[in-house]
Structure formats: structure tokens, C-alpha cells
A protein has these predicted regions:
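Aromatic-rich carbohydrate-recognition surfaces in CAZymes
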Residues: 111, 503-516, 520-521
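Acidic, Mg2+-coordinating active-site segments of isoprenoid diphosphate-utilizing enzymes
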Residues: 455, 480-500, 513, 518, ...
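Alpha-helical phosphate/pyrophosphate-handling elements in metalloenzyme active cores
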Residues: 419-470, 516, 521, 574-617, ...
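Structured soluble/peripheral alpha/beta segments that form catalytic or ligand/cofactor-binding pockets
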Residues: 1-184, 189, 193-375
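Conserved N-terminal diphosphate/IPP-binding helix and adjacent helical/loop segment
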Residues: 375-474, 480, 484-499, 554-571, ...
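Short, contiguous, pocket-lining structural segments
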Residues: 195-201, 212, 236-240, 505, ...
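Short hairpin/turn module used for nucleic-acid contact or packing/dimerization
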Residues: 327-393, 703-747
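Transmembrane helix-loop-helix
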Residues: 521-540, 676-677
Length: 747
């Protein structure tokens, strides 16, 4: 392959397959600085067989405003290809897969994806790319390019040209691992497996950028590349398909691209130095390839995708005595599209370090593709645990902290009233029991709901991140108090707080945890008293419902079960069990979702539909919890795999009345119901008796009745909400959440 002078890219690979043209620029308008990443991709085509599919994507970063946004435009061929891949996928959790197929079957695309109004055109020699009049890329006849994007909310018109002798394009063929979406499709935004790449030198850009309602006349520099070949659907052989890449232009004229395959996803944020390959270009065009190390730093978890990305990296290239730290302008520069719903980081970044012992600075792009296929929805949701723990640590720090303790005690307006000794006592009594209980965080799905409800309405949840702590602390406080009232010695496999700290301390600390929301609202909604009032009203209703549910729990359902067994009428018993489940589980989940909707500015009809849906989700979750109890309840373990959280039929063994047992009253012969109930009623049945009772509940259809009820609850309430909210990846995941609540096991 011979590189041609000028900016225009090389011809396509005759092998066919994905073909991608990609640009990245740093642009300035006076003191304002922007980053632009733009890609035009063709997936398949005549050379590779099958119908052509096209996608045009761009993302803009506004450095001073710390805002990132963009658009993705696809043709019907791309939609059809994605639908086929999703339908054939057997790796992604079926609940997520069905939710995406449901969206696509309605002719809807999750934002930021949009359907091109007209067919795309891709012509070579001379280059002429047209994405339905939305995106145009053409040669200008003088070795440069004209690129234009006319989106609904953003766009640009730029002339790109070589900067002169120092900017001669130079070619090298690189190999990058495949980047695939959740359905297995190659991402047009990422290096393609075994894809030859023409890497152009720096390009100059001049033109107009439209973003967030304003236009800027910009100039700047950047680069383009063209990658082609590889497989759209790579083999799933268990290999880590993630990758990271830093591309930097230094102020001494050198350019650097360092690439690492694998190890890009680290949910715990632990940095590790990994082997990488660096390709450098000297100011006079000499190309140097050398071994390097790359260490990810400053982890940030996206509340949209729950990916954890390093937002900075340290690069070392010993051969050239180069040490460089590259840091993103700001963390939230994540890109998501229908061809890569797992998400990826495309962060414009600054770099500084030394080369040959001399200081150097630069700017460029830091990219991370974590390849997080959602193979297990529950494990995916559980990724929010790390964020939840961080936010809890801010409210309940491990060591006594005057500011947090005065807030906790309600004396922030007069902090001098609490001296050192008092602060020590407050920390031991109020913080200790809560941190003890949260050390074994569960699924944290309530925290997930609190953020997902905001995203559902197209609002960025990042400014409201502290709400995840309030959601979890509400649950934690109730667990601490419930364990005292139920005389439970264990919680999440650890001694309960009252066993360690005493009942009086535990009850007080658990109750105090309910007020975490007050502290959080003062931070995230400091200037909106009316909105805070509505949030408080919802939250106080949640607290009332929780105490009502615990009252029913303490009273128990034994007498109601006795009566149902004698009369053969299960309806009153079922209503009673459902009431307890609604008050203790559904009402809090509904309230947390409603708080998210209020924060997002949802309309009244949206607010009502969301409340009904989360009523159903919470009740379905507790019904499926009762079903899971019969089979042994597990949860994703932090170190991988799953760990048991309940023994098989633990509730049945304790003589508790659950939904399967209540449904069995109408499904088993009266004599068998009586035998089963009185065998477990007093909580002293042996293992064989409990196992036989659990088997009877499965065989008589009681479990099927529960799963059917849970499924119907969710399906009946999801469609009205779905039709009222924007079609986004948050809405796809919200549909999957309902399916998960109704059926917790992965099929």
C-alpha cells in the first residue's frame, strides 16, 4: 500500500468487511476549547457480500463547560444488521436482548441513534461519502477534505488540509483486537480485528462548530485514520476483547500512539501496568515502534452504562526515555451507540511528562473500550456497588470527621458545640453500626433505580450521584432496625449490627440513617426549595410505608394462613401477603424512582406511569424473591461467581408464609395443604420435610402462579411508561429491569 500525499484517505481493502474513516480534532475559538471525534463507517458491502450498512457518529467535548454530547445516524441496513445479530446472540442476558429487540421492533432507535432520512452513498476516487444528507465527506480537489455534519442538535462544517511538509501523511499497518458490541457486532468506532490502518499525519481544520445552541468559528489540528477488513461478528472464544489507546501530539513535534489489548475493564479501579505497543513519529517523519507500558489511573464509573474507566494513564517508552501522563479534560466523555451499547470512553486529554530528560506537553485522545457485554443482568446492576460505597464513605467516613459528624448530628450551623471527645462518641455510635452493615453491600439495585429513573427522562444523573448513598442508607437503616425486632443474629453473612454494638446503639444508628437524604438534598438541590419539598413528601411517604410493612411483618401471617387452610379460600391471605410485600419493598422502590423523576423534571403523566411501573417492579421483585427462596438465593460475589445469601427454602423452614405457600392453598387438595402447612408451621421441620414441601409447591403450580403474576404485573405497567419517555439506552435497560424483577434467574 502506498501513501498518497494530502489528506485524502487510501482506497478500501479488496477483502471487504467493515470500512471506517475516522477523525479526531482539538478545536479552538479564542479562549474556548473543543474536542471532536467523527466517524463514518460502512459495515459490509459488495466485496464482503450482503447488504450495505452505514453509520455516521460524532461527539463534541466542550472543555470549559465540561459537557459532552453527540449524535449517531444509521441507515436501515445497519438497523437490520444489528437486529439480526441481537436475535442470534446467545451470550447477552436474554432480558436485555429482548428489551432491545422490543425497541427495534417498534421502529424506534435508542438515542443518540437516529435513522438517516435517505440512503447513504460511499464512493471512491474521488472520495464522496454522503450519509443521507446528514453527513458529507468529499475531497476538495487540492489534497484536502470537506467534512460536514448537519444533526438535529449539533454539527460542523470543516475544511481539512495537510499542515505542510511537517504534516506528510505516512502509512503503517497496525493490528488491533476486535471491538464488539453486546450483540457481537464490530464497532465502527473502534479498531477492527486484523484491520490495516492508514494513519495520516496531523491535519489542520478550519470552519464552524455547532453545539448546545451556539456556533463557534474554530481552527485546530487533528488526525484521521482509515481501518478496514476483519469480521463483523468475531468468534466468541472467551478472550478479553477490550482495549485502550492513547494518541498524543507533543509540543516538541513528536506524535505518539500507544495501544494495549485486554485489561481495560477494572470495576474495582485497581491500576495495573500492562505491556503495550507504542508507535511514534518524529518531527521529520521517521517512524519508531517500541515496547511500552501503560497504566490506567483515576477510575470513574459511568452511571449510564456502569462501566468503570480509567480517566488518565501513565505511559513509559524506555527506548526513547519517554514518560508521559495523559489526563482526560473531564471524566464524562462516554460514547454509546446501537453498534456499541456497552459504551466506550473517547476522552480528549492533555499530556505532560519528560522525553530524553526534557519536559514535554501535548494533547490528544484517550480511548477505552471495556467490552462489557451484559451476560448477567443482575451482575451488571451490581456494578453500581462501587459507586454506592464511595458515596456512603463521603457521608459516613471511616475515621471521625468533624464536618460529616456535625451534619449527622444536625449541628452544622454551630459546629463548635461538638468537641473532639463528643465527635469520637458520635462516630462510634452513629457511624460504626452503619459502616459495619454496609461493609457487606447487597445488590444495591435500589441505588441503581435512583439513578436509572433520572436517566430514563433523558437527564444526566451525574450531578445527583450522592443520591445513591441516600437510597442505600434508607435500606440499611431499615435492615439494622428489622434485625433487632426480628432477633436476627446475622445479616449478609455477618453478625448483625445489634449483636456487635448492642440493641440500643443499633436502633438509634439505624433510625439516624433515614436522614441521610436530608444531607444529600442540601448538596444536590441547594437552590430549589419547592423541588426539595416534593422530594421530602415522597420520602416521608416511603418511611410511613416501610414502618407499616414492618408492622405487618411482626404480626405475621400465621393466623391468616390457618384460616385459609381451614376455608380453602386463598384470596384474603394473598391480599395480606401482597400488602406486606408492597409496603416493605414496592413502596420504597417506587419512592426512589419518583424522586429520580422529580429531579429529572418529569411531567405529571410520566410521574404517574413511572410510579405504577415501579409499584409493579417492587412487588414482582419480592414475589420472585419468595420463589428464589425455594431454590436457594444467590447473588453476584465481588470476587466473581455467585455466593449463597439464603439456604434453600429458608423461609419455609422458618414457618414464614410466602407467595408460593399462599397460592398453594387454592392449588393443592385441602388435605395436602393442611399436611404441608402444619409440617412447617412451627419452624422446626427437618431438612427432608422442608425439601418435600418445596417440591410440592413446585409441582402443584404455585411457583408458576407466582412467576406468572410477577410477569403480568410488569408487562401491564411497562408499555404505558415506555410510550411516555424518550427512547434511550436507559429505557431499554428499564424494560430489562422489569423482566429481571419478575424472573430473577437467568434463562
Amino acid at each position: 500500500m502506498d501513501a498518497r500525499p494530502g489528506a485524502e484517505p487510501d482506497a478500501p481493502d479488496p477483502r471487504g468487511g467493515p470500512d471506517r474513516l475516522r477523525f479526531a480534532f482539538r478545536l479552538v475559538d479564542g479562549a474556548d476549547e473543543y474536542g471532536l471525534v467523527f466517524s463514518f463507517a460502512r459495515l459490509g458491502g459488495a466485496a464482503g457480500g450482503g447488504a450495505e450498512a452505514h453509520q455516521a457518529v460524532w461527539y463534541v467535548a466542550d472543555r470549559s463547560a465540561r459537557v459532552h454530547g453527540g449524535e449517531s445516524w444509521v441507515d436501515q441496513g445497519c438497523v437490520d444488521a444489528v437486529r439480526a445479530l441481537v436475535g442470534a446472540d446467545r451470550v447477552t442476558d436474554p432480558r436485555v436482548r429482548r428489551a432491545l429487540l422490543d425497541t427495534l421492533s417498534q421502529g424506534r432507535l435508542p438515542e443518540p441513534d437516529r435513522l438517516l432520512p435517505r440512503a447513504a452513498r460511499w464512493r471512491e476516487a474521488p472520495l464522496d461519502l454522503d450519509a443521507g444528507d446528514v453527513v458529507l465527506v468529499r475531497g476538495d480537489g487540492h489534497g484536502g477534505l470537506l467534512v460536514e455534519a448537519r444533526g438535529e442538535e449539533s454539527g460542523f462544517r470543516l475544511r481539512l488540509s495537510p499542515p505542510g511538509d511537517g504534516g506528510r501523511p505516512r502509512e503503517h499497518v497496525g493490528t488491533a483486537r476486535a471491538s464488539t458490541d453486546a450483540a457481537g457486532a464490530a464497532s465502527p468506532e473502534a479498531p477492527v480485528l486484523e484491520a490495516p490502518v492508514l494513519e495520516a499525519a496531523s491535519l489542520e481544520a478550519a470552519g464552524v462548530l455547532h453545539f448546545r445552541g451556539r456556533s463557534a468559528r474554530v481552527t485546530g489540528r487533528g488526525w484521521h485514520e482509515r481501518a478496514f477488513g476483519g469480521d463483523i461478528l468475531p468468534a466468541r472464544d472467551g478472550r478479553d476483547a477490550s482495549w485502550s489507546r492513547a494518541r498524543v501530539r507533543l509540543d516538541n513535534g513528536w506524535e505518539l500512539a500507544v495501544h494495549r489489548t485486554g485489561g481495560a475493564d477494572a470495576p474495582d479501579g485497581t491500576p495495573a501496568a500492562c505491556g503495550a505497543t507504542a508507535v511514534l513519529s518524529s518531527p521529520d517523519g521517521e517512524r519508531v515502534e517500541a515496547p511500552a507500558t501503560l497504566r490506567g489511573l483515576r477510575p470513574w464509573t459511568s452511571l449510564t452504562t456502569l462501566n468503570t474507566y480509567p480517566t488518565a494513564c501513565d505511559v513509559e517508552v524506555p527506548l526513547l526515555d519517554l514518560r508521559l501522563r495523559t489526563t482526560a479534560w473531564f471524566p464524562r466523555q462516554e460514547a454509546v451507540s446501537v453498534t456499541a451499547p456497552s459504551g466506550r470512553l473517547e476522552a480528549h486529554a492533555d499530556a505532560e511528562g519528560t522525553m530524553g530528560g526534557r519536559p514535554v506537553r501535548g494533547h490528544g485522545l484517550w480511548e477505552v473500550f471495556p467490552d462489557n457485554r451484559i451476560e448477567d443482568f443482575e451482575r451488571h446492576v451490581t456494578r453500581i456497588r462501587a459507586v454506592t460505597r464511595q458515596e456512603i464513605d463521603r457521608l459516613y467516613p471511616a475515621e471521625p470527621d468533624a464536618r460529616s459528624l456535625t451534619e449527622l448530628a444536625g449541628t452544622e450551623h454551630r459546629p463548635e458545640r461538638l468537641d473532639g471527645a463528643v465527635l469520637e462518641d458520635l462516630h462510634a455510635s452513629l457511624v460504626g453500626p452503619v459502616r459495619h452493615t454496609t461493609a457487606g453491600l447487597g445488590r444495591s439495585w435500589r441505588s441503581y433505580v435512583s439513578m436509572a429513573a433520572i436517566e430514563l427522562f433523558g437527564v444526566d444523573s451525574e450531578p445527583y450521584r450522592p443520591l445513591v448513598a441516600a437510597a442505600e442508607l434508607l435500606h440499611t437503616g431499615s435492615l439494622i432496625v428489622d434485625d433487632v425486632e426480628d432477633r436476627s443474629p446475622l445479616r449478609r453473612g455477618r453478625p448483625a449490627a445489634h449483636v456487635v454494638f448492642g440493641e440500643a446503639v443499633a436502633v438509634n444508628a439505624g433510625t439516624a440513617a433515614y436522614f441521610a437524604l436530608d444531607r444529600v438534598l442540601n448538596r444536590v438541590l441547594p437552590d430549589d426549595a419547592a423541588l426539595r419539598l416534593r422530594v421530602y413528601q415522597v420520602y416521608l411517604r416511603v418511611l410511613r410505608a416501610g414502618h407499616g410493612g414492618q408492622a405487618i411483618d411482626i404480626a405475621g401471617h400465621r393466623a391468616a394462613m390457618d384460616e385459609a387452610v381451614e376455608t380453602g379460600d386463598a384470596e384474603a391471605l394473598l391480599r395480606r401477603v401482597r400488602s406486606g410485600h408492597w409496603l416493605k419493598t414496592a413502596a420504597p422502590v417506587r419512592g426512589l424512582a419518583e424522586i429520580g423523576a422529580l429531579v429529572a423534571g418529569a411531567r405529571e403523566e410520566q410521574f404517574r406511569a413511572l410510579g405504577e411501573y415501579f409499584d409493579a417492579v417492587g412487588l414482582a421483585y419480592q414475589i420472585s424473591d419468595d420463589v428464589m427462596d425455594l431454590r436457594g438465593l444467590t447473588a453476584p460475589a465481588e470476587g466473581g461467581g455467585r455466593s449463597a445469601t439464603k439456604h434453600t427454602a429458608e423461609d419455609l423452614r422458618a414457618g414464614k408464609v410466602t407467595m408460593p405457600l399462599a397460592h398453594a392453598v387454592a392449588l393443592l387438595p385441602p388435605r395436602r395443604v393442611r399436611e404441608l402447612w402444619y409440617a412447617v408451621r412451627d419452624g422446626d421441620a427437618d431438612e427432608a420435610t422442608v425439601a418435600a414441601a418445596a417440591a410440592s409447591l413446585e409441582e402443584c403450580g404455585a411457583v408458576a402462579a407466582c412467576t406468572g403474576e410477577a410477569r403480568d404485573l410488569v408487562e401491564r405497567t411497562w408499555k404505558p411508561l415506555r410510550d411516555l419517555v424518550p427512547c434511550t439506552w436507559a429505557s431499554v435497560m428499564m424494560g430489562a429491569l422489569g423482566a429481571y424483577a419478575a424472573r430473577r434467574e437467568r434463562e
